Amino acid sequence: NVSDFFNLFPDTVLTIVDSHPIDVAASHTKVAILKHAVTMGEQLILFSEQTQFILSSSADNLTPLTANVLVATEFESSDDAPPVGSGSSIYFLTKKGDFAGIREYITQTDVTLKDASNITIHVPRLIPSGIFKLAVSNNQDILVCLGTDNPNKLFINRWLFGTQGQKVLNSWFTFTINPNRRIKNVDFIGTDLFLVIEEDTHVTLEKLPFESDYKEDNATFEYHLDHKVTEASNNVTVAFNTTTKKTIFTVPYRLRGEMNVVGRYIASNETSTFVDLNGTTQTLKAGTIIKTTNQTDGTTSTIEANGDYRNAKVIIGEPFEMHYRFSKQRITESPQQSSAEIISSRLQLHHFYIKFEQTGFFKVEVTP
């Protein structure tokens, strides 16, 4: 009842009043068991496994007498992952045998015809089955898929709308972490994706920023490291052994691979120095990689380096690799964006030029 949320029964059965609970069925020729509901503007979209419905009202007010559940579209969906809304679209999961797909359900108030385009049509075998969570960032136009078949991998979709509301970019990529770690859940808060990650003995909460041109404080470039901490972070200690002449950095997590200790950018009123093995005090320049001397095998949380770095300003993290595969090259009939591809001839690439500026090391692999 109105203002009585836990009272699910009408006060009288002789008449229907506006304050009674709304109890309306979704009538259809198919079996329609409603699984999920997503609000979109002034509409409530209801999902069954084969049909989408809209909860609407025949009057200005939504009451037991005016409520209607109308059939909107007929698309198969999976109830393994709840649909998520972004802008005027709803993204929901579909099953395709051993693989999964994502459809974008478009709702527009000025258009009565609704549609759900397949945004994985160009990557039909990318996403495996077992997806159980969808997360979306409205600020960054990003959709993240998490499944049980690859618990250490995220499948991420990024889109961009051009003029007149036309989607000009629909790209997919993956984000993979250490195979000994399992992602249990993800969700966005603002532009940051928070991940619950399970290991053999403990669970951690980690953050993956999707902010454009993200940089550390005072830095002119981004450090491409995972699990970044500084010497000033909580639970990070820097100690010096006077016998071995080594600095011991202790971080608040177990080290799973090779770690980098890098001099970080500092404010104008700060200094960053270290003492080498000869006893000479030197300035640690930003971007300088400090050579470490111990191996990290997943059982320790310490990093050792020759010299005294107790007065150094550093950033500590795990380096990672990024792989990019170019899309299939094609020749079109005209330079227009929607022009058809010429398929009556054979395409042979003689040269392929890559323009780059102010980048780090990268390697290009060409497969004949």
Where are these predicted regions, by residue range?
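Short, surface-exposed beta-strand-loop junctions and turns on beta-sheet-rich folds
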Residues: 53-54, 59-62, 151, 201-202
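Beta-propeller domains
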Residues: 1-21, 55-64
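Short beta-strand elements that form the blades of beta-propeller/WD-repeat-like
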Residues: 1, 35-48, 53-54, 81-95, ...
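Sequence/structural signature of beta-propeller blade repeats across diverse families
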Residues: 18, 57-73, 104-120
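Short coil-to-beta transitions that initiate beta-strands within beta-rich domains
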Residues: 18-39, 71-87, 123-135, 178-184
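Catalytic or ion-translocation cores adjacent to nucleophile or general acid/base/metal-coordination motifs
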Residues: 59-102
